[in-house]
Amino acid sequence: MKFVFCFSLLLACSAGISITSAQAADGQANVVCNFSHMKPDDAIMMPDMPGMAMSHDFMGNRSTDAFSTAETLLQRSGTTCNNGADSTGYWIPTMKLPDGEIVHPTYIKTYYQAYNVGQYPVTGYPHGLQLLAGDHRGNSPNPHISFLCANGNGYTNKANQICGLRSKGDAVQFNIGIMFPDCWDGKNLKARGTKNAVYSDNEGQCPADHPVKLPKVNMNVAYVLPQITSLDVSKVELSLDPQLVDGELTPLWGSIYTAHGDFMNGWTEDATRFMADHCMNFAMECSTNIPYSFTEAVADTYVSNQTEADTNFGHATTLLVQDDWRNSGRNINKQILTLIKFKIPPQPTNIEDYTGVSFKYKIRLYEGNITDAKAFTIFFYPTTPDGWDENTVTWNNKPSFKYSSDASLYMNNTQQFRYVDVDSAVRAALAAGKTEVAYYIGGERNGRTISVNSRESGKTPTMMLVGYQKVVEP
């Protein structure tokens, strides 16, 4: 059985079409997951009771069943989601069309969102967190459940639409939006019987008895139905808990107003921490750039030649880059190089579970041209991570390097986070038995100055291991 939650805020986003909302998110990330499997299981409401729950459609973790726990989701972490860091179990009741056909979601697109983070910052999801949304006994509109016809006028709480063919003319697309609560009580990880989470108010503030604000899970379930040309939403049915009669289970069905969703957190701990501390709380649109694992720079500084050749800049909050190869060349002109070191983030120990997922190493920096409005390329030159300290290194005692780059980054004068692919170089370092890598960042060779935020600034340079696989959104 499901517990009934009554809440007050609706913010709905579409999967596969434009987003509509009552309030724009400050920070946001998203994940797209294909349908995985159907089972009459529910690990939140009927744990360890296989076959006893209503029929559910599962997305995300491929192994989710009645016995799933936070531990098993990470141990058997194969996922249908495009972000390899997300092995969450997402599930919803199975749908039946008016003609009796059972259909499954084509995909879900889930937005992770935060509001008013300057005043009310979010915390990463705790390991083992479960969330519920909606009412499986519902018979009227719910403020946290919404419906959309792709050929219509956006999301509505009322089931009074008749969906026609979407703009492509190839199928009826019907979406269900499910908004999960975002204020946790800080104690109860399990949702069954605890009311462990409620919704923040319109300002993004959580109540005193549920003080821990989390990124809001805004799940959008898309059914792409090429076999029909019209759908009366009021006649759609969803599975209910079966009835036990004479020792046999009889399936039951309810109206579309019984729509609800279950969430069992399967993000890696690094991913949830990054989502909160390095994305949402910076009011960023991070899209799919939520890493499986990451490390923050363990050392960063810059070195400068000529009159500053013996000066150390280890405590600088802003690092500088300047490179001028004109006229007499770089050794005569002013030159400033940023020096940065990372521990290499760990890869999955169960990599065989991640069929289809491509993992790549990236560096994320907050930087920009501070000389003029020009756009240009900067370069990442490998150097040794050993034998230098950010608090003592200067131009005159800096580690050696060659002007042969492992990576480059095209950038302009906008100060923002940027990502650079260093996958090949980091994998070569791993193959050589290294656990750390270090880089000089060199300029565009025409004398312009670039600023890079250091680890002392709050916008810490990070090295990320990002896993991605293509998910079809027809």
Regions found by a protein language model. Give the residues of each.
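C-terminal segment of classical bacterial N-terminal signal peptides
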Residues: 12-21
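Positively charged n-region of N-terminal signal peptides that target proteins for export
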Residues: 1-4
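Extracellular/lumenal carbohydrate-interaction signature centered on repeated Trp-anchored short motifs
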Residues: 332-334, 346-359, 429-430
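Flexible, small-residue-rich N-terminal segments that precede or flank a structured functional core
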Residues: 289-348, 444-446, 455-471
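Beta-strand-rich interaction/scaffold domains
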Residues: 367-430, 434-435
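Primary mode marks residue(s) on the alpha4-beta5-alpha5 output face of response regulator receiver
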Residues: 25-53, 57-178, 186-290
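A short beta-strand element within beta-rich, extracytoplasmic domains
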Residues: 340-342, 352-370, 464
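Ser/Thr/Pro-rich, low-complexity mucin-like regions
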Residues: 428-456, 470
